[in-house]
From Swiss-Prot:
Record-given protein name: Heat shock factor-binding protein 1
Subcellular location: Nucleus
MF (Gene Ontology): identical protein binding; transcription corepressor activity
Top-rank taxon: Eukaryota
Lineage per the UniProt record: Eukaryota, Metazoa, Chordata, Craniata, Vertebrata
Pfam family, any one: HSBP1
Keywords of this entry: Nucleus
The keyword Cell cycle belongs to this UniProt entry's keyword annotation: no
Keyword Transcription regulation: no
Gene field: HSBP1
Annotated PANTHER family: HEAT SHOCK FACTOR BINDING PROTEIN 1, HEAT SHOCK FACTOR-BINDING PROTEIN 1
Stretch forming the signal peptide: none
Length: 76
């Protein structure tokens, strides 16, 4: 086997470390973007739920639902 030049090993180690750091930075950036988008979607879903509840209240759906519910003891 041929001996490996220490300078070559050192250069290869440096290149691999740089590559791994770049990959870690890219994954961190993507992770931050994904978390930001999930937070944004969560806020939008909360707003939608509130708007739907408000619309149902305005339409009187809650009143209609409570009027249509008959307790099990009163059913024939």
């Amino acid at each position: 086997m041929a001996e490996t030049d220490p300078k070559t090993v050192q250069d290869l180690t440096s290149v691999v470390q740089t590559l791994l750091q770049q990959m870690q930075d890219k994954f961190q950036t993507m992770s931050d973007q994904i978390i930001g988008r999930i937070d944004d979607m969560s806020s939008r879903i909360d707003d939608l739920e509130k708007n739907i509840a408000d619309l149902m209240t305005q339409a009187g759906v809650e009143e209609l639902e409570s009027e249509n519910k008959i307790p099990a003891t009163q059913k024939s």
